[in-house]
């Protein structure tokens, strides 16, 4: 809950504080309307309030957010990915989603760092399943090109890093030969154990290059990855596994990682959050993606 409070107050100031204060009333109203019980806040909240509980006897997750547009998009994306390893949407509204809860619900982060090879293969299986989904004929999902327009803004990022990221972005976008519906944020905490299978949550929903999908996983978990003795070797191994399992060129995966990391740096600056992790990561992976 502390990270949620920090992020919301940093992004929304007094409006964010008011929303946080109103959460008990909002939660109680939703619980009453949808017959929810046993609601318990989860430990890893970042930008949305999330609680586990039950609807009758069915395990559920309740997600409430300030950004109704983002939640509406997430719900649409979960529905587009239906039957492709994602959580089922039970009910939704402008500021909330009630969805299937994974049981036992342990995340892929439990495999880090000791079983990172296995975790990366699980990631790849999840990606394969997700990318079987068709792009809906009518949708509100942005193309990756729209997402990366953020890099064209005036940003407090060193020129050589920003220029390289823009170069890689342009090269990758212009050489994309296949486009799929992307999860867009497929890191460890968004892949959960559900029985003997794995369930994906929290899709962002973008259209674009399949090679972009591993990027979120490659730079996570934050901050634990960079606290390891050999984080560079971990990332290199992950890239090689993803390349082999997904039949995607390793350089292309590495280039998207670099561009995505600079984008995350830009987002951190926009949201008044600490961006040091991204600076440190980019220094470490600099020669993964030579600017050619």
Which positions does each model-derived feature cover?
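Active-site Asp-x-Gly
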Residues: 194-240, 247, 274-290
